[in-house]
């Protein structure tokens, strides 16, 4: 399930899938279970999610992802 019921913002399946994909890709990069779970904490508003964006070389679109985090 992509949608986190703890998130209080706008429910947008496309945004959740996009944010969740970052955590999945980051998990695949490091193969550490805590990466995937920590990345999703606090509706993606955390330092691990931000680090994953950097590690996945998504630096040029960070603002787009941060905007998504603020939406959900």
Swiss-Prot record:
Zinc among keywords: no
Pfam families registered for this protein in UniProt: Crust_neurohorm
Alphabetized PROSITE patterns for the sequence: CHH_MIH_GIH (PS01250)
Modified residues (Valine amide): 72
Tissue expression summary: Produced by the medulla terminalis X-organ in the eyestalks and transported to the sinus gland where they are stored and released.
Modified positions (Pyrrolidone carboxylic acid) in chain numbering: 1
Modified residues (D-phenylalanine): 3
Subcellular location: Secreted
InterPro entries linked: Crust_neurhormone_CS (IPR018251), Crust_neurohorm (IPR031098), Crust_neurohorm_sf (IPR035957), Hyperglycemic (IPR001166), Hyperglycemic1 (IPR000346)
Assigned protein family: Belongs to the arthropod CHH/MIH/GIH/VIH hormone family.
Name the UniProt record assigns to this protein: Crustacean hyperglycemic hormone
Lineage, uppermost ranks: Eukaryota, Metazoa, Ecdysozoa, Arthropoda, Crustacea
């Amino acid at each position: 399930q992509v949608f986190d019921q703890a998130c209080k913002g706008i429910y947008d399946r496309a945004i959740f899938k996009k944010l969740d994909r970052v955590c999945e890709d980051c998990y695949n990069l490091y193969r550490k279970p805590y990466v995937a779970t920590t990345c999703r904490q606090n509706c993606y508003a955390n330092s691990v999610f931000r680090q994953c964006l950097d590690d996945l070389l998504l630096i040029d679109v960070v603002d787009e992802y941060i905007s998504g985090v603020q939406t959900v």
